[in-house]
């Protein structure tokens, strides 16, 4: 154990952006690590974390820094609300599960909700998404029940408890539908989702990606307009964490793996063709290089980006730090999600 601790201290001390995020210098990393090990050392926490599939480096590279930000925010803000954004497949749900466990270890009780929970019921959602050229009826702006989401955030801010709808992706042959609701109580609200914090953007001639059809370009512009409806929701958040892939094409590989797990569990899952169309729809609806810009200072009362993290193709953390410390994937890589090349992704 002493040798393992020494190696970990050495590895963490070399990560300049990681230390900047946590306000540490090389000399204080060892003492900081000992405090975290004390907090995480109970059998209950160890067993709960072991039950969450993750790469070993994710604990110290992503999970602990994020829960430290949450703890810091909780000390200064009553009933804080934070957003967690990342393209499909980055492991936001897993990260949310980890925050629920780690929050308890650090002395607070987070409510973890997904923007997917707030999808409109299928008939209403299908009607709202009828103009979608990808024939996908969940995911893009306009498919969420913003009235319920805003009510959840406001009820939590006022009372520390709220109602969150449940969405079952396995219903309706993989299209998914609402399945009741759950009452939650806590002292921190974490909202995760692929488009959390996304803002209206000015679409250019190569948006959403080079080679897009006229219908896809029109859909992209429409979704940008619809993002204006989400602005008041994002203003209810105190900060954002962005988790991004090293290359945009990793997202399809991760979603293929997720659908395979869904299929093995006996639940409805999307076919390969449906999945390609879904990912292409996501990119056309909210191009992350346009709608999520971590270095842009909010001027509309929106939440600031507090932390960014980059994952490689195996979901290993390769960089983490404050905005500007992590490289943003080049917009040109978005062409990997275009109709002509999406089948070769991954």
Label for each model-derived stretch:
Residues 2-37, 60, 195-346:
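Conserved NTP phosphate-binding and transfer environment spanning the P-loop NTPase/kinase superfamily
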Residues 49-74:
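N-terminal pre-Walker A segment at the start of P-loop NTPase domains
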Residues 53-54, 111-114, 118-172:
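Conserved nucleotide-sensing/catalytic segment adjacent to the nucleotide-binding pocket
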Residues 83-85:
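Short hydrophobic/aromatic beta-strand immediately N-terminal to the Walker A/P-loop
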Residues 89:
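Walker A (P-loop) phosphate-binding loop of P-loop NTPases
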Residues 92:
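Conserved lysine of the Walker
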Residues 95, 99:
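Hydrophobic positions on the alpha1 helix immediately C-terminal to the Walker A/P-loop
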Residues 152-198:
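Phosphate-binding/switch loop-helix module in NTP-utilizing enzymes
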């Amino acid at each position: 154990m002493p040798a393992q601790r020494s190696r970990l201290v050495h590895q963490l001390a070399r990560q300049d952006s990681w230390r900047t995020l946590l306000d540490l210098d090389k000399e204080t990393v060892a003492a900081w690590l000992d405090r975290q090990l004390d907090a995480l050392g109970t059998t209950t926490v160890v067993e709960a974390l072991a039950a969450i599939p993750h790469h070993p480096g994710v604990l110290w590279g992503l999970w602990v820094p994020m829960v430290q930000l949450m703890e810091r925010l909780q000390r200064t803000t009553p009933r804080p609300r934070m957003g967690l954004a990342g393209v499909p497949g980055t492991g936001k749900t897993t990260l949310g599960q980890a925050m629920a466990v780690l929050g308890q270890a650090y002395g607070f009780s987070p409510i973890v909700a997904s923007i997917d929970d707030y999808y409109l019921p299928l008939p209403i959602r299908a009607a709202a998404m009828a103009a979608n050229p990808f024939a996908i009826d969940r995911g893009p702006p306009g498919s969420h029940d913003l009235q319920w989401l805003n009510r959840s955030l406001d009820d939590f801010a006022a009372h520390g408890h709220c109602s969150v709808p449940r969405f079952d992706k396995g219903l309706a042959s993989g299209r998914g539908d609402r399945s009741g609701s759950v009452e939650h109580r806590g002292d921190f609200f974490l909202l995760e989702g692929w488009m959390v914090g996304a803002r209206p953007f000015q679409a250019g001639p190569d948006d959403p990606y080079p080679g897009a059809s006229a219908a896809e370009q029109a859909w992209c512009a429409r979704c940008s307009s619809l993002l204006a409806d989400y602005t008041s929701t994002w203003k209810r958040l105190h900060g954002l964490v962005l988790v991004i892939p090293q290359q945009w094409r990793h997202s399809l590989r991760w979603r293929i793996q997720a659908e395979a797990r869904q299929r093995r569990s006996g639940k409805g899952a999307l076919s390969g063709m449906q999945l390609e169309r879904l990912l292409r729809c996501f990119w056309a609806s909210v191009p992350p290089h346009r709608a999520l810009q971590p270095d842009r200072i909010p001027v509309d009362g929106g939440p600031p980006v507090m932390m960014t993290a980059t994952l490689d193709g195996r979901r290993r953390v390769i960089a983490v730090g404050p905005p500007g410390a992590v490289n943003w994937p080049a917009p040109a890589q978005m062409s990997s999600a275009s109709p002509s090349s999406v089948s070769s992704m991954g």
